[in-house]
C-alpha cells in the first residue's frame, strides 16, 4: 500500500472522521458526567490553557472594546492566534455568533 501524503483528500477525510469521533465521544462523556476527566486525559495542560485563551479571545472580539494588538498584550497570545480567531468569528454562522454573544457576554 502506498503511503498517503499528509495533504491528500483521503487523509483529510480520515482526519475529519477522527475529529467527528472525538466530538461524539465528548458528547457521550457529557451525558455521563465524565467530560472533565476525558478532557484532562485527552488534552495537555498547555492545550487546556490555549483553549481557555481562545475563549477569552472570542469573548473580547465579540465585546469589541479592544484592538487586536491590545488583546495580544492583555492575553499574552500571539497576534496570529488573535487574527485567526477574528477571521474564524467572521466566517462563523450567524446562529453560532448569536449564541456565543448570549453565552459569553451575558454578564455585560
Swiss-Prot record:
One of its GO terms (molecular function) is DNA binding. It is found in: Cytoplasm. GO terms for cellular component: cytoplasm. The keyword Transcription applies. Signal peptide: none annotated. Its main location: cytoplasm. Pfam families: Trp_repressor. Keywords: Cytoplasm, DNA-binding, Repressor, Transcription, Transcription regulation. The keyword Cytoplasm applies. Residues 68-91 bind DNA. It comes from the Bacteria. One of its GO terms (biological process) is negative regulation of DNA-templated transcription. Belongs to the TrpR family. This protein is an aporepressor. When complexed with L-tryptophan it binds the operator region of the trp operon (5'-ACTAGT-'3') and prevents the initiation of transcription. The complex also regulates trp repressor biosynthesis by binding to its regulatory region. PANTHER family: TRP OPERON REPRESSOR (PTHR38025:SF1). Homodimer. This is Trp operon repressor. It comes from Escherichia coli (strain K12). The gene is trpR.
Amino acid at each position: 500500500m502506498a503511503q498517503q501524503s499528509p495533504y491528500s483528500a483521503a487523509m483529510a477525510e480520515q482526519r475529519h472522521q477522527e475529529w467527528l469521533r472525538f466530538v461524539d465521544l465528548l458528547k457521550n462523556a457529557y451525558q455521563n458526567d465524565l467530560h472533565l476527566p476525558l478532557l484532562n486525559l485527552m488534552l495537555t495542560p498547555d492545550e487546556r490553557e490555549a483553549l481557555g485563551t481562545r475563549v477569552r479571545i472570542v469573548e473580547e472580539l465579540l465585546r469589541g472594546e479592544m484592538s487586536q494588538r491590545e488583546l495580544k498584550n492583555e492575553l499574552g497570545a500571539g497576534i496570529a492566534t488573535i487574527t485567526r480567531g477574528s477571521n474564524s468569528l467572521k466566517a462563523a454562522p450567524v446562529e453560532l455568533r448569536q449564541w456565543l454573544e448570549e453565552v459569553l457576554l451575558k454578564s455585560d
